[in-house]
Regions:
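SAM-dependent transferase fold signal centered on methyltransferase-like domains
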Residues: 1-153
């Protein structure tokens, strides 16, 4: 899961192309991981209006189509950011990391929890690209994180 200069150029050049036809013509693109490229193209299409700031960042990696379908929009993440209280926040369903990223702009310490390793890898890469250093990534199921916690009575 690496965005080389050639892969980024391929994605930009084929952003509006029919991805089924691209897949069928994979042999015409030696050196390109065509499945990964197509996933990135489809993800970028999905976020163009939903996440305009992220769409403008060519270096970001989208771990799956599902992650871009299920993530918060920038507007929603900014709204959630306004609701924050305190200096530490834990996002127990990290996913693509949209909420986590916007939480990190307000809170001093943010914990991103995600059970899928490829999402954690992408989040680590993306947070670095976005110059966000106050996020701690934990690869775990949210239930395992909250189970030892006890509620105040």
């Amino acid at each position: 899961m690496q965005l080389t200069a050639g892969l980024k150029q391929f994605i930009r050049a084929h952003l509006t192309d029919n991805t089924d036809k691209l897949l069928l013509a994979a042999s015409r693109f030696p050196g390109i991981d065509i499945r990964f490229a197509i996933d990135q193209i489809i993800a970028r299409r999905q976020i163009q209006h939903k996440l305009p700031f992220w769409y403008e960042q060519d270096e970001l990696i989208y771990p799956s189509r599902l992650s871009t379908e299920q993530c918060s929009s920038e507007q929603t993440a900014l709204y959630k950011q306004q609701l924050l209280r305190g200096n530490t926040v834990c996002d127990l369903t990290g996913g693509l990391g949209i909420d986590t990223f916007y939480f990190a702009q307000k809170a001093g310490n943010v914990i991103y929890v995600e059970r899928f390793p490829e999402y954690c890898t992408a989040a680590q890469h993306n947070f670095k690209v976005l110059n966000t250093s106050n996020i701690h990534i934990i690869h775990s199921d949210a239930c395992d994180i909250i189970q030892p916690l006890q509620a105040d009575t």
